[in-house]
Amino acid sequence: MRLLALVLLLLCAPLRAWTYSLRYGIPESAQVWSILVHLLGDVDNQLLTNLYPLVTGLDDEIDIQENLVALTSNVLRERYDKEDVADLLELYASLYPMGMIQHDISSNAEQDDANSSYFVLNGNRYEKPDDVFYLKSKDLTIQQKVPDVDVIQPYDVVIGTNSEAPILILYGCPTVIDSDFEEFNRNLFMEAMNGEGKFRFIWRSTCSLDGKSVEYPLTHPLEITLQNGSRMSSIPQLKKILYTVPKEILVGADNDDQLHDLEPEELRELDLRVTSLISEFYQYKKDITATLNFTKSIVNNFPLISKQLIKVSSVNKDIITSNEELNSKGFDYNMLGLYINGQNWKITSLTPYNLLTALKTEYQSLLKITNLLQELEPSKCILDSKFLLNKFSQFSLGKLQNLQPIKMDLHTIPGFSESVIYFNDIESDPQYDELVNSVQAFFDKSKFGELPEIKQNWSEIIFVIDFARLEDSEVKEALGGLVRAVNVVSQGYPQRVGLLPFSSDSDKSVVNKIYELKNSTDNLTELKSFLETMLLADGLSANAKHSKHIPVPDVFHLLDELQIDETSIIINGEIYPFRKNAWNYLIAKVIKKDTEFIRKELSNSSPKNKQISVRDLLHYKSANLRHNKYTPNYFADSVYSSVNNTALESVCSERIGYYTKNEEYNLLHTITLVDDFGSIHALKRLRNLLHTSFVGVRIRIIHVGDISDIWYQLRGSLSQKDPIGSINTFIDALKLKKVKSHTYKKSGLNQLGLHKWLPDIPLFELQKGSFIALNGRFIHLDQNEVPETEHFEAIIKREALRTIDSVFALDLLFPGFSQEIINPDLIEMISSILTRLFYQGTHIYNNGIDYTTESSLPRMDLSEFFRPNNLTMFEDGKSASIDLLLILDPLEERTQMILSLVEQFRPLKFVNIQVILMPTLELNIVPIRRIYVDDADIVKSITSEDSRSDPEVDIEMDVPNSFIVDNNYRIKKLLIELHSFSSKTVLSTGNIDGMGGVCLALVDSAGNIIDKTTTMKTFGYGQFHTDKFLKGCYIKSCDSRYTVQSFSTDGHPDFIPSDSLDILSYNPQKIAVKISEEPTHEEEYEEGRNNDTIINIFTILESGPDEEERYMQMILSILSKCPETQKVNFFILDQPFISDTLRKSCEYINSSDEMRGNVIFLNYEWPQWLRPQRFSSRRRDVSRFLFLDVLLPQNISKVLYMSPTEVPLDPFDIFQFQGLKRAPLGLFRMSGDGYWKEGYWEKMLRENNLEFYSTEPAFLVNLERFRELDAGDKYRIHYQRISTDAMSLVNIGQDLVNNLQLEVPIRFLKGSYKKKLVINDECVSEWKKKINKFASSPGDEDVPGESVSSKYQDSDNAAPLHDEL
């Protein structure tokens, strides 16, 4: 019977495997296993081993009909008491149908082998399942000698009972195509798990996403926007939506089918009324889940029930009091949003994928801390870890606010004071005689605003100006700013102003002249006059020639030390690139911050009447060395990893050495140098490190090269009091090549052990050479890079701050902790985890610097402020490791998304949901205009093919920014964002200007171009789109002026270039690209730009079939009159609502030689850094101008924008207009009376002698001139600046271009260009019949007369559209 059972099991096993669903071609077993490895790989390998037979279909008790995710979750809960892992598994499986593909696994399996199974032993490949039973003992013995660390890769799980047995590798994917996988797997498992355990094995899945379409159906929430006057009956599913509204609110609802905005008096207290209603509900139910559902049902359906809300609710005055109490504690509307243990998440980053990853990362990090705390006291639990994190956040918050960007005490740098030319001295100049020399001035009201009336040189602004670049507008503005500042301080303004002049070219005559005038005896009067004249004149070469060649300070060396290579401004020791739009703001910000810091320090430590040096107080923590790599401006620019010192055992103890200078002090800081110490560079690095003067520092070295006599001698020398002499001897011997050394191991260190030690650093980065690690801070070293001792000291000084904060926090958890002997391994690990959580808590994907204009808040300890009052503050009330705090204004559209998002994560038992309601006391605008539908069944109903809504209703699916959705609400493409910078630019959070106007291409592993983009200047932003998952792709330049020097998915100041990119999941992709300028091939670059035979027409459609019909009519009308010598390109912005019918119609046109036209769909998504535009119609309107420079191919020099009309203007006539030389835009003047003739507009236009222009029905653009003026960047920055006001830009596209005429001029088009095109009706009618027939035919029907070269060409590949281009 047992034999029969085994036979049946073997026969049924393949069936069991194939019953699992395939998603993107990935079997469910592979999906579930990859997720489990992702969740448990660093936590519980034994549990993974136990689950392996269940997941891969080897468990005899498995129900072959049961869903594998549900089955595995039940087993986790019932058999292993792993509720947390079970909940996370279900969430990951629902969001990642492809599983969690690990990017840094080197499979060793060829792509051609993806559909076959085999295993590898000793490098030999075995392709028959029965080969498992005939393995030779000799082969197993040879494999057994290979250390496990040389075999096991990240995310590998070793299956087998005998820990001494050799390891085999199984390759395969359990699909129908790979029919042998089940037998391979079963045979290996049986042999590995039997009593003897001849071997162990690892399964490395060959299931691949590479090249598979990303298309997938979605059921994300829908945003249904209804305008005032819309009829409820326009949405057939509205009755289903209303079922989600509480019945008590719908009581008394009238039968008025039409929606109306509320009157101002009805709006005023409505937010308070709704908050009162929610509060009353919670007080009755005492159930936060029910309360959140109740709140969501109101907020999501607000446009439908606003009238009823007025009738059913009244205002609880206690809520106003609660608001006031929150305000007194520092809470305001800028804090609205979602917080994970006090870590704020930007609203644009809130997606199910990001929130799930953030919760999992937070939870597992706290578990790691808990394990470490239990080494000190076994009774400690995960709540103690949360307490520790909160206290660390308290201590670190000040560091984040005051120590970035890095502040320099510049006067400690040799030569600085002698090089700066100061124009005033507050301590001695007569205009400051009325000031007082007492710090009490910081607490008194000042007539100078933030600057106190104190007679000290504590605050200074230094203009660093490149006088070789005065033609640059930024440099000119800097000089003008200096001249104005000098005039202001001469009137008694108490701020020191200085100049640090330099010249970036070989001509130093102007700089020499400036220093000559500095040394004159006229109290700088002549120098001031010289600078004023220079500002007004075109050049001063004549004046500068008379400069005497007197000795001048070595400014070039000084600026090299400060790493300044462009015109900059130094504000109280903080160095910023000078930008004319930002420098005044920066001065105000820094002075306000520093004044508050000094006031706080004086309050804590010093009597107010005491005379002290304010400057010394300001700079007592300042640096005296600036290095963008070792001590970057911002903590976010650094790379941090958690540290797992227990993994160092696998690295091999004989490769590790330690040195401590003084053991009298606790060793809080461990700096590790990982290097090949058989090289001169490595020994020099170590020598410089050993020269550091700090105590309390442990030095660890890890040798990655061959094990030899030199290494043993070096490691032995570390036990000496002063090993530097021995190291110098080794260096001298290596230089003279007199080293005789026996090599014991001719192999380098396997970096996999290092990856386990620093798990947040990608494996490929650890394999790229030497590096430094300091309590989790990671610094890669180039091959010949040798940091000086002062660099090591600067790194230690900077990073020590966070370690000391860790000790302070531990002191609160373990009183007296810092007074006892501290285990350096423990503090290294705990401080590294706390650092990563606090300083980079939102860097969950390790995808580099987040370039954004959106403000974000640091992690804060909000636990002390959250006090449930059952009125506006309530929570689950359970003790959980994660507090998920929602600070909400009930009547705000963001609240819809947050509540719907959080509902998905309520099953997580380790999450405690907290709510703070902060209603607007007086509403004056309609707060919510959209219905938010998150019920999956209703979403499916609305989005189904046979249940479309009225076209006048705007329906959008709320998907992550990286998802591009089609008209069937399926993922159509994935968005990949990039930021391009000059190879000379050091990447930093402070970077704003990138490389704009550069064409870049995304290329797959076979060399095929997937997509092209043109970059913006702001953040160097660009975007690619892919409709396939990709492995091994890369980025290259498609612009002959530039070359891609390097790129990385983890962009930071010292990033290690990636060899390739993998796009294998839904996680957001952000790529940093470094670009170098190549010699300009002007003729090659300009070729084909101007072609008079091609007319380019650009259009952005509104939604609805009527608009599409007008557009098609316009195309056919224009083509019916197209001369035989010309062709017309119709560019259209691709949008989700565009129908398949229109796409097929365009396909026909592109295939017709008769029509001489081409319709090109352009892809461009709203950039994440740009302030979102809520209403889609306004988004489309302003996009006509915001993205012109990056949306259209670079080889297009002239384009006509036309709104869809059945009888269009004559584009052939307008295109002949030659007046766009200085001005890039040609628009028709606005006629009649309107808002532009009153108020702000009337005044602005009159004072600047400007006209007001209309953007309808067409406008002409000289794209070459548009790009020369950086018009696109100017429009985007102007939009970003003024769109903070919800009432600005009422007619958004039209108002934007009219408002910026002084920077982007407009030329008027004569009224005669408004003449209508005379249409060939007969031709249009005939074409329509053919198109309609083709559009209604099956999708695979060929177009009559279609040739290979004329097939429809999508714009994903922005290649030239015609040979003429």
Curated annotation (Swiss-Prot):
Biological process, per Gene Ontology: cell wall organization; fungal-type cell wall beta-glucan biosynthetic process; protein N-linked glycosylation via asparagine
A GO CC term assigned to this protein in UniProt: endoplasmic reticulum
Region forming the signal peptide: 1-17
Highest rank taxon of the organism: Eukaryota
Region (Disordered): 1334-1365
Motif Prevents secretion from ER in this chain: 1362-1365
KW Acetylation (keyword) present: no
PANTHER family associated with the record: UDP-GLUCOSE GLYCOPROTEIN:GLUCOSYLTRANSFERASE, UDP-GLUCOSE:GLYCOPROTEIN GLUCOSYLTRANSFERASE
Name of this protein: Killer toxin-resistance protein 5
Species assigned in the record: Saccharomyces cerevisiae (strain ATCC 204508 / S288c) (Baker's yeast)
Gene from which the chain derives: KRE5
